[in-house]
Structure formats: structure tokens, C-alpha cells
Amino acid sequence: MKMLDLYGYTSIAQSFDKICISIASPESIRAMSYGEIKDISTTNYRTFKVEKGGLFCPKIFGPVNDDECLCGKYRKKRYRGVICEKCGVEVTSSKVRRERMGHIELVSPVAHVWFLKSLPSRIGALLDMPLKLIESILYSGDFVVIDPIATPLSKGEVISESAYNQAKDNYGEDSFLALTGAEAIRELLVRLDLHAINANLRTELESTTSEMKRKKIVKRLRIVENFINSGNKPEWMILTVIPILPPDLRPLVSLENGRPAVSDLNHHYRTIINRNNRLGKLLKLNPPAIMIRNEKRMLQEAVDALFDSTRRSYVSNKAGSVGYKKSLSDMLKGKQGRFRQNLLGKRVDYSGRSVIVVGPNLKLHQCGLPKKMALELFKPFICSKLKMYGIVPTVKLANKMIQNEKPEVWDILDEVIHEHPILLNRAPTLHRLGIQAFDPVLIEGKAIQLHPLVCSAFNADFDGDQMAVHIPLSLEAQLEARILMMSTNNILSPSNGKPIIVPSKDIVLGIYYLTLQDQAQSEDEVLFFGDFSHVEYALHNKDVHLCSKIKYRMTYCNYDVEGNKPSYYSKIIETTPGRLILWQIFPQHKNLTFDLINQVLTVKEITSIVDLVYRNCGQSETVEFSDKLMSLGFKYASQSGISFGCKDMIIPDTKTMHVDNASDKIKEFAVQYQDGLITRSERYNKVIDEWSKCTDLIAKDMMKAISVYDEENKLNSIYMMAHSGARGSASQMKQLSGMRGLMAKPSGEIIETPIISNFREGLNVFEYFNSTHGARKGLADTALKTANSGYLTRRLVDVAQDCIVVEYDCKTHNGFAIRSVVEGGAVVETLDNIILGRVAAVDVYNPITEELLVKAGELIDEAKVEKIKIAGLDAVKVRSPLTCEAKKGICALCYGRDLAIGDVVSIGEAVGVIAAQSVGEPGTQLTMRTFHVGGTAMRGVETSNLIALLDAKAKLVNSNVVEDKHGNKIVMSRSCEIVLLDSVGNEKMRHNIPYGARLYVNDGQFVKITEKIAEWDPYTMPIITEKTGIIKYMDLIDGVSINEVLDESTGISNRVVVDWKLHLQGANLRPRLVLVDDNGNIITLSNGLEANYFIPIGAVLNVQDGQKVHAGDVITRIPRESIKTRDITGGLPRVIELFEARRPKEHAIVSDIDGYVEFGKDYYRSKRRIFIKPVDDKLTPVEYLVPKGKHTIVNEGDFVHKGDLLMDGDPDPHDILRVLGVEALANYMISEIQQVYRLQGVRIDNKHIEIILRQMLQKVEIFEPGDTMYLVGENIDMEEVIKTNNSMVKMGKSPAKYAPILQGITRASLDTNSFVSAASFQETTKVLTEAAFSGKEDSLYGLKENVIVGRLIPAGTGFLMNKIKKLSLLNKEDYSMYYDSEYQDPALLQSDSNNFGHDLPKGNNNIVDY
């Protein structure tokens, strides 16, 4: 331990390894107590001294004042340990009043409310009695038979009082034993034989067949086994002694007006003591039984109120009502409870807060600290220095000197502050960049100055934001602040690895202006320059302008293959003086050429330049470069004179034409609707589409008009702001000078009359009123969603907090194949973006040259990504946190690159928390951003066709095509896909072609870029005939299963299928269209089945009974819902739904096997049967029940693959896991979650989502227990099961079989191995009850548990400290052996009995050697 003392590391928090919790026995309560309390008196009302024998008795709890007894006889430290013979008080420190407990001996036992009422009731489960019966015994005076002796009554039977008296008369006084109240329950519990119950339940479990009964038995069996294993006795759930909290934890404080403020607990204790004493006196008087029973009930209620007042059914006892007294449970749970208020978050000394202002002249690592603030914060440091230099003799005089602000004080303050970093924090701290360290610079004034480039990390602006300052005191804290938290060390964002110190707003505008080029300049006016000094001179003399075109002699540098021996050559290039000015601040590196900036730089280019500089030149160069870039940006933004002018909003001349065209088309749709050619929802969809197109066209023309470079005004200011990415966007410009477009109602529906005006023209009253919808919804949403998003972050942090990097390599070869992400035909995320920073799971070869590109277990960095890109690979297998085999955490290689530093992650990094923050932080950002577009509908035109994005060869998969009467090829397959292959045959793109689409290419045909491959109607789902024949209606009965729906506005009737189940005669109908030949025989389709087309509710029939149809004709249409706008408002609930692993409301059914679809002949109540017939006839078909009227997306005879959807809707993640396994689940969840974030333009690395998923997949369900003690259907930790199975195999017994299960993040947080962590999260009383009767141990592995008990967290520096601690406990031989062989034999660490966690291989500099 000496080694630990070096670090000041031994304290009470370090002196234990785990925390255990169990039910307190009466003996242990008495042992903890220093005396029994029988009196309710607190303090004397005249002397204000505490009363002896009362609730604050000094004899029991210790002296009120340090080293002073009550009567004042002994008053010095020298009498410590003496017990005063006069007043009986021990002379000691008054601190013991925070530790010493008392107790109350109860005259009659009472039930502990947690074990009685916390569901499932533990007492009820052990006795196998419903809660209602137990309550009737405890509160209503019913009797329970304990021992029937010689009567026909049965043991445990509950009888009313009258029945009890009747039985006494019938059988005699002592012929049976029946009791009431808590004594009865206690007696029953004492007489339980848990081992016998356990054996009986196990035999019963084997014989039972009913699922409900099984679940009930398993529940009870778990509780019984937990009791047996924990060593708790059942009768301890009934209290005979109540402990009393130490008095300083329930203090009596006198207020200013002399009235005492009493803690609520004292009120509860007084009630209990009063009722207990009264009951004791009553019992001596031998009164009628009813009085005793009433008094006992009141005592029971008083004890209930002390432990948990919310569990009582009284109205007056609801929290928040007048007269409500806080119970012990209330003190623990909720945001204001002990866990969350005092243990996980504490107020901090040495801190201050103030408003922030911008500090453009600061360096990146500095912040401006007001002198007044610094003086107060560093006061103790200044005092000690003043004394040390002998300026003042005492601290008191030093304080006086500081108060008077003498000149010496300022000098010393400068010295103290020098290289002493301070922490700045802005609430809400959504990710770790919300707290960063800076070197303070003293400034006048009262506001903190903040560097502009760190604003995006803090999400700060200067409209009145406040920030808090904290001072790291100890040397270690200062060291950590400087090395880990300094703003210069946090250049990259931990969520996506892109720079977060990027210029924005004015800086971008300045750089954009600096790199512009004058388009109107003629070739004759172009000047030649050979040196930068000449360019500066010409600028000074106004011979050239910043944006003028010039010819310049640029020196280039050539490197040989190894990158050494540079050779120089010159080249004349066309550029501008502005770009040359920018080039002067660039660091020199072979990968940073002038071509990078010889273009107009927008925010996107600037970001990639900062990224390049970081990757090539390192951190310090990047910091310097960013600072210079910022000053340049500010300088030229102010010189440019760009401002927002009314004339800059140019309204395109074509606007009226576009609006007229759209109006004409909409009139056409109205006519079609009147003629009954289209339905109401189709017309609505088409109108919305038309206006969307019109708005886009106007916006396009506006951008064309606005981006023209004219001689007079040069470039348009507003265009420059939007184009550079400094402020505003194309959609905002569209609203300013194009057309505001369609608005959304609060419900998400789109109002079909658009706002034709823009803000430049001004809106009319009607338009203004329409646009208020969206604006208000935006503001209301913001308020609601912020809370939702914050709660999501809290749950994510809680589920992932114990995921830490514990070793370098877990040696696994598992991983996932990664492909690029394609959405709607376009590649939205390229392969190289996804695999960058991951580790290859297997060797990666070039398919053509067979050259080894990446070795297995090697990090894929930028250079390797480039190789993979050149090789044209479309999939790479990489390691993933989900497949990592490390125990108690993950390994560095499965995680890959730490995105914030761009290198392999260090051991001890808390990757779980980083993942949670990365996923949660944008949620809050986005929810706060809903109203930025002012509620305009963000919906694009629905995709209705597929266009080739590259020259390629088309290959059709699962295609079943028929030709219609016009010769068009119609897709008849539900799973038709088109794959585009490049010249080598690598798959470049894969698309689904919907059923009913018109196909324009053949299998194997070459398609050119922009060629149309297929098109379809996005608003209806058709049902199409496969052969030519005559239509016959079956079970389509007017008024039952089909209605003529008359459209009031058009007078035309459509035949619509209605819900036939609602009708009496409709019970056995199966509405369908049948295709027959001329002889009336049903036609057989190509798959050998009859041509029956089943029709769902809501479908519109396109054909009459007896009508002749051609192959490829649409016979019915199912209108799709009109699409609502999707912003993160719809998106955040979706993310929450996925992380909570909830079943979607109307989830699609997933096929469990490969096979052919067959519709069941009978209808089953309100369900419809679908059979999947396996290819192998020996296997039995699988049956699915689909709700009637739901549209199945498969036809009879279709071949479906395992995991295909059989009907519309989102699939259930649990089904995907069960049918297709972990990899498919991971792919589904990642793509769904990323889709929501991508919609908002937020980039999150997949590995963060994978880590959360890993935490959600930690439990398995046992379906065959083998020889283990597990029960069928039980959910157990996967690591534990693997461990048990290994030991079973060693003993030659059969192991348990299990399947992984997916838990939502809340469930997973509550089911964690640490009860301390779970209790501090949610449902505190429930978690503690569960933990207590199971006698749980908490080994303090996670971060949260350690914060709560006051230790260093086992991550980062704490990870190393833990290792040192374990090493210090080794004996000398082991210790030296560990260090001797550490680098020679890595296996020693693997099999380390002391469980040090595994180490880095030799040569990695992340380990500090002590």
C-alpha cells in the first residue's frame, strides 16, 4: 500500500472491494444501535438543550458539542472517552451523531412495506398468497389458520372474524391455531421450509404444460432460490425492531423567528413511538380485541409511512399534497433523492460563473478571465504566496490585503495563474467537449472571453450565454486538465472524427471572399507576378484587387518514391492575390499543395483542409494554422463589406410562369378527380407533388439569377453568405425571394394550398395565417423534445457506462462485412467512409492482382482506405465491438481508432460513455433546431423511377416479368432486384424494384448513365393479372364486403372493399378476384397455383365482374397513405423506439424459413392464415396469422427467403434477431438509426451505435437448461452462462442451450450486475428490494458505482491506479515476476490470477511504467 500512499490514494473508499446488501435481522439492528428510544421529546422549549431519552438523546447518540458532556462537567479534549457519571454522556467528537443509530422495540411486529407491496410481493410469493389476502390479514383483521390441529380447516386458510368466532364455538378454544395481523404472517414465514418448497416447485415445473402456470412457478422459484442462496430468513421481512437514523441526518434547525424546522423523519418516528407506547399500555389493560387490532393497524400504517408513504392508498399521502411527509424511500429516489442529487452530482468549491463575450484576439488555448473573478477563485493560493514571501505574517492580514486590492496582490495573482489551467463548462454539457481546459488571461470587465473556434464544441453563442469556471487544485488534476482537456487537444469530434475546431460564420465569409475570383476580368488585364512581395506591393498600390485574376510563378516540390530528396520546379498558374495571402499561412508539407486553395473555399472545403493539415502535420501545426485562419477570416470579412441588403433578394422572372403552369396542372387533377379517374388521396398526393416541383423550379431559377456575377454589384451578398455556408441555406433563400412553398399542419399533414409569396413580396393575411401553424408547432416541439432527448442521453449513458477498453486484443476473428450504404438508388455513405479507423477481421486482398492490402488485425487508415478504393472492393470484413470477446469490456482492436485522436484507442478509455454522448448529443441539438426552417414542409417529390448513376451492366434477380397489352414489361415479383455491375463484374449498386413497376431494361443489358431503368406509381400499390382472362368476383357482395362509395364532390362512384367482418353474413367471406378462361375454368398461373387475387380492406376495384383483362393489367389499386413530413421530431421518437427495442405498433411478420407462400383455406376469427411451405417436403410448413384486411406483400406461390417480410410495416427487431441473428440485427438497427440522423445532416460513427447495441445484447434466454440450475425461459447474463457451461463441460455434464435476446436500454440498465448503478437510475425502491432479498454483491466494476462510493472511476487514469493497487497487494516474487516477464511473455497477463486486465504489446506508448 506504500505505493498507493504516494498518490494519496488510501481512504475509506479504497478500503473495500465490494458492497453487499441484504435484509437486516433484528439482531443486527440491535447490534448497530446504541440504545432504545421510548420517548418522543426532542429539545427543551426553554433551554433549547436536547432531552435525555428522546429522539435526540445525547446519551445514546453522542454529545451535541465537541468533547463536552450534556451537564458541562467534562469540557476538554483530554477527557475523550470518559462517560460522565452525572448525565451519562460519553465525551467525544460531535461527529458521532452522524453515525450512531438507535432503535425502537415494537410491541407487535409489523410487515416491511417494501417486501409486501413492491410488486411482485415477496411475502405473497413465499406464502403463495395473493396480496389482497395478506393485506386483509394485516389491515382488516381477518384471521389465518396457522395450525388446524384437529379441525377440518386447512393450513393457510383465511377466515373472517365472524367465521373465526364460529369455529371457536364449534371446535373449542384450543382445537386450532389462527392468528391475525403481522404476527400471523410472521408465524407462517417462520414455519416455511424453503428447501422443500424449492424441490416441489422444480418437480411441478417439469410436469406442467400450461405456459401461464410455468411463468408463475418460475417467478416463485426464483424468489425461493434467492432466499436460500442469500442466507436471509423469510421472517426478517416482518419487523420486530425498527432502526432509528442518527440525529444529525434528521436535524432540528431553528429558523430566524425562533420556530424549529423539523425533518419529516422525526415526525414519522414520533408517530411510531407514540402508537407503540400506547399499544404497550393497552395490552397491559387487557381491553376488547377490536381496540388492540385497531391500534396494531395504526402502528403498521405508521411504519409503512416511515419506509414508503407512496405505497399507502390514502389520498392525503400523495407526494406534493399538503401535509405530506417525506419517507425514507422519497429521500433516495428521483432527481432530488440522495443518489442523483448528492452522490452523482455535487456542488463544487472554487467555481464561478459569468456571461461570455467573444475574444477574437485570444489564442486557441486561452480564455479571458475577469480579474475580480480570478482574485476570488485563487484567493487561497495568493494568501499562501503572500505568507511565503513574508509580505504578511497571518492569513487574516493576507485576506485584508486581497480585499483592499493592493498592487502586490495583482503581481502574485499573475504568478499564481501562470500555467495553471482552468476549466470552462457550458450547460447543458451534452458531450465531453462541453468542459474544456484553457490557460487564463486576466482581463478587465466582468465577462469571460471565449475563443470563437471553440464555440461549436460548446454550442455557445454570445446572446447572453453563461459559462462556469472551475479550478483544478491538485497537481494531478492540473496535469490531467492540461494533457487531456486542453482545448488544443480536442481538435477532432469524438462522435465522427472530423475536426470540430472549424471556422464558421464570419470567418468562413472572410475566407470565401478572400478566395473569390473576378469572373468579368478580360485576359488583357491579367498581370504577371513572380514573387509574393510584388503581389503585396501591387495590392498596396491598388493595381490589383484581392479577387483579380493574376498569373503567378509558383514553386512546386517533387519527392522521390521514399518521400525524401525533394526536387523543385516552377510553374505559371492562374490565381488571385487573395488565395496567395491564404497560402502564406499554410504549413509546409508534400501533401498540402497550392491546388487545395486555388478554388473558391466554402465551409466544406475549409473543413477538409483543416482535417488534411491535422492528418499530415500533427496537432500543434493545426492549432497554429486554425488561429491564423481565424484572424485572416475576421480581417477580410470586415474588409469585404458584405451586408444583407433588400435589393440582394432577386425574385426570378419565371416565377409567375411556373406558378401558372402548376395551377393549370392542379385544375387538370381536379377534372380527373371529378371524372373518377383518380381517388381523393391520389389527387391530394399529386397536388402536393406538383407544388413541390413548382417550388423547386422557382428556387432553381432564383439561384441562377442570384449567383450571376455582375459588373456593378460584383457578387450578391446573400448568395455569398449562403453559398459559403456562413449563414442561411438554399431553403431559407427560397423563402426570402423564391416561393415559401407548402406548409405543414401541426399533425404533420401538408396543407395543399402553398404560400406563393415570399418574404420580399410579403405574405397576405391568409398565407400568414397558414404559416403560423408550422412556426408554433416548431416552438412547442422544441420545449417538449429537449426533455425527451435529455432523457434519452441519460438512459444511453446509464446502459453504456461500464463499457471500457480493458485489453489490447481479444484475438477474435469474428466481425461484420461492411458495404456502402445505398438509399433510394444513391450512395449516401461510401465504403471508405465507414471502414476508416476500423480493424480488418481477415486479410484483405485485391481481387485482381491478389496483392495483400490489409493484414488481419491491422488498422485501416487513410492510406489503406485509398488502396481498397483503388482495388474497387465492395465489401470488407472488419472487427466490431459487437463481436468482441473481451470479458468485462471491449478490446482496443475491436473498437479501432479513437476518433478524437485518430489513433488506436488507449486502454482504459470509457468508450461506452463517449458512445452514449455521441448518439445523445445531436438528439438535443436537432430537437432544438426543428423551428429553423419555419415549419415549411421539407418533403421532397416521391421517388417514382430508377435511373442509372453510372455506366454498367444490369443483372436482374428474382425477376418475374409479364408484357401488358402495350408491350411494356411489368414486374410481377415482390423481391425483384436489379444489380449494376462494373466492367470487372464487381457489384456497384443494388436496388429493389417494386411490384407492378414498368421495366425498361433486360437481363444482361448495358445501361448508360442517366438512362431510366424502371418507373412506378409511388402513391398506389397495384394488384396485377399475370395472364389474360375474364375477371370473376368471389365473395364480393354489395353492402357486405364491397361498397359503392359515391364521391360527393365528383358524383362518381368507386367500388371499394370494406371491412366485411363487421357484417353478420361476412364471417366466412374471403373477398377475391378470380381469373377464368372462356369456359369458366380457373386459370392456373406459372407457379402452378390458381389465379386467386385476395383483396385487402380499402382497395379500389378497377374492373367489373365478367370483364376481359390482359396480362399486366391493374385490376385493383390500394391507395397509400399521403406521406407526412419527417424531421427529427418524427425522428427522435423513432430513435427512442429502436433503442428501447419496442415492437412497432403494427409490425410486419417475418418469415422464419425459406419456402413457398400458401394461403390457408379457412379464416380464423379475425386473422388470415399464411403458410410457408419449406422446400424440403419432410419439414412441416410454418403458419402465420395476419390480421384480416392487412395488405400482405406476398402472393400465393411466391418464394420467400428466411427473414423476408410477409406484410407491410416495420419489422420487429426481436424477430430479426431470432430469425437472422446478431449481424442482421446490427445492420438493421444501424441503418434505421443512421437514416434519422442523416436526414438532419448529422454524422455519427457506426461504432458508437454498435457499443450501445452490445450493451443491449448482454442477456441470453435459456431454452434448454441441460444439467445446470437454470430454468427454461430465464434471462441470464451471457458471460455467466458461458462460464457455467464451460464448467459443466469440464465435469462431463450437459451444458445449457440459449439464444441471445435484445433488451431495451431502460431494461438493460435496470438488469445490470451492479445494483448500486441500477438503483441510482430508476425504480430505486424496486431495485433495492430485489437486491436485498437476493443478498446481491456489487463488485464496483462500472463508472457509476465508483462515483457513488467516492472512488476514482476505473477508466483513464483510474484504470492505471487500479492496476497499481492490485500490484501493490502482490507478494514480492509475483511482483518481480510480473515485471520481468511482462514484455517477454504476454501470456502471463492473460492467465493473470489477479485479473489485472490485459496490457498493451511492447512499444505502445500508452502505458506509463512505474
Swiss-Prot record:
Binding residue positions for Zn(2+) 1: 69, 71, 84, 87
Binding, Zn(2+) 2: 810, 884, 891, 894
Keywords: DNA-directed RNA polymerase, Magnesium, Metal-binding, Nucleotidyltransferase, Transcription, Transferase, Zinc
The enzyme's E.C. designation: 2.7.7.6
Pfam families assigned: RNA_pol_Rpb1_1, RNA_pol_Rpb1_2, RNA_pol_Rpb1_3, RNA_pol_Rpb1_4, RNA_pol_Rpb1_5
Gene Ontology CC: DNA-directed RNA polymerase complex
Tagged with keyword Repeat: no
Reaction equation(s) it catalyzes: RNA(n) + a ribonucleoside 5'-triphosphate = RNA(n+1) + diphosphate
Entries under Gene3D superfamilies matching the protein: 1.10.132.30, 1.10.150.390, 1.10.1790.20, 1.10.40.90, 2.40.40.20, 2.40.50.100, RNA polymerase II, clamp domain, RNA polymerase Rpb1, domain 3
GO molecular function: DNA binding; DNA-directed RNA polymerase activity; magnesium ion binding; zinc ion binding
Self-association state and partner proteins as the record states: The RNAP catalytic core consists of 2 alpha, 1 beta, 1 beta' and 1 omega subunit. When a sigma factor is associated with the core the holoenzyme is formed, which can initiate transcription.
HAMAP family noted in UniProt: RNApol_bact_RpoC
Protein name, per record: DNA-directed RNA polymerase subunit beta'
Organism: Ehrlichia canis (strain Jake)
Encoding gene per record: rpoC
